[in-house]
Amino acid sequence: MITGDENLRVLVTGGAGFIGRSLVKELLANNFTVSVIDTVSSSDKNAQSLIQLGARYHNGDIRDSSSVEQAGSGCSHIVHLAAQTSVPASIENPELNDDINLRGTKNIINYANSNNIEKVVFASSAAVYGDCEDVPLVEESAGDCRSPYAESKFQCEQDLLSLMPKETQVHILRFFNVYGPGQDANSNYAAVIPSFIQRITSGQSPTIFGDGSQSRDFIAVSDVVNLITQILSNHNNPQNGVYNVATQTETSINELLRIIT
């Protein structure tokens, strides 16, 4: 167990989401003081589970600067998970995608600048690599964005790295295909796994697009959460950093199906 500093108060944006819930629970278990901002109603079961564990919960939108200020009051660190995460939705409505991701992140930056935030951890995405065929992917290969979602994530990275005060540590984490307990089959994080499980348990055959030879790098949400917790706890982090959050192990869709069944 990582022992947190009880005086270290963390604002988790998107804390009621798939990764956010696991992170908030881990932080609370390690004695961090946690504040959450999410558009999910405080009466929702996911929000209630966090409230019952001791999180300060704020039903708000990161696009509203006053909501960010209220949720972040007294916090020294920020984990910015809140985002529009659907690639198809970003193509269908790029303006909304940018409004949530870009304007929301600008509000986080403004809040950090005005409140002496020590450290910001940002959830980016492997989507910023586009169709780059270099394996393994290196952080410097990013920028070949193929969707408004990817473009917005890459722009958020640039904004965070360029607009934060030098005293604030910025850690950009490019998540690959995150999976784990509590994942919705309709989610945007490696949804193939819960989709397979859902169809199998309901007596249906899993749907495979193509010949199933396409591969992905899957990483457990527990590993993602442990990494973020360590970054928050470590006072010797480098000033800024951009990191791939993956396992460097490729698993084909066919192999994944064999593992699940």
Language-model features, listed with the residues they occupy:
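N-terminal Rossmann/SDR dinucleotide-binding element
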Residues: 2-77
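Rossmann-fold scaffold of SDR-type NAD(P)-dependent oxidoreductases
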Residues: 13, 75-81, 122, 244
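Hydrophobic "lid"/C-terminal helical patch
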Residues: 23, 160, 228-232, 257-260
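NAD(P)H-binding glycine-rich loop region in Rossmannoid oxidoreductase-like domains
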Residues: 62-99
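Conserved mid-core alpha-helix of short-chain dehydrogenase/reductase
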Residues: 67, 107-110, 159, 218, ...
